[in-house]
């Protein structure tokens, strides 16, 4: 995410009503996205959702069947890929095995027939940017996976494009290296200030570095927002389930109490929970509507004692711990409620004084969350 280190460069990108089919398969279905100048923007979704196809259309490697792609208001469809203001970093590095790090990075500049002095200046600048200044004479087969990807990033940036397109660039790396390189990539973005468009299926990658995210599925953009908006206020059931873990239920609105502009309490009947719950909702849901309700596992509190009633805004359900899972900084509990529904609860470890008594397998527990911690996702019918 941008921290204001560099002046904003890059360009605004406008994608309007873009569609693309391969035979009978609809890869993109009327997709519209606006990306701001200098933004770190992620296209996030499962395999086959259309995110890479959209990136390839922006890059100029594919042509859409319909729609417009514009850089700073100028339609770039019909302009060759090498004439656009963008460069692409691929998952497989695409390095020349017979060339050194220096020559791989310098290659685009040699095609432009720049002077040796200018080439050397830029190569040194960008090898320093990606922390490879001590490896310039090595061949790709002498580099680690992370170092190879740094070479690919430097080569893509050395032409000084307005837009850097990244097609799952870290997916071939191990988890720790992927995490470290992601931090470096975010730092590079902050330093150079151009527009980054990052394709990934990994929600944690997108949430940790993006200014905004477009969540895609089956060729459509389901939601665009900041990481906080996407996680805390998912627009659809798919987004809620794809981004993190959640408890998701079908519900019926049974009552609404609107006592002020910032006080709109809704009562939901949820058969899977065997009763009703309270939720704060600002969209003025109406009684009788069928909706989806979600509460994140980390929002649910788990205790051995029944929590004291706090007005009518605390939702409490009793159950038995069916499967406790310790995962370091937190424990995950799968609680079988009295009516048979399985509820996920994540408890982050603070310290032994704050954690309270240890909760174990087969313990009877109480799961609770406040009305402000749940969320009505979408109205299924009016």
Kindly give the residue locations of the regions a language model identified.
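ABC ATPase nucleotide-binding domains
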Residues: 40, 79-241
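The feature captures the beta-strand-to-loop junction immediately N-terminal to the Walker
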Residues: 44-46
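ABC ATPase nucleotide-binding domain helices that frame the ATP-binding cleft
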Residues: 52-55, 151
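Helix-to-loop junction immediately C-terminal to a conserved catalytic motif
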Residues: 59
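Conserved ABC transporter NBD signature motif
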Residues: 67-75
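Non-catalytic connector elements of ABC transporters
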Residues: 246, 256-382
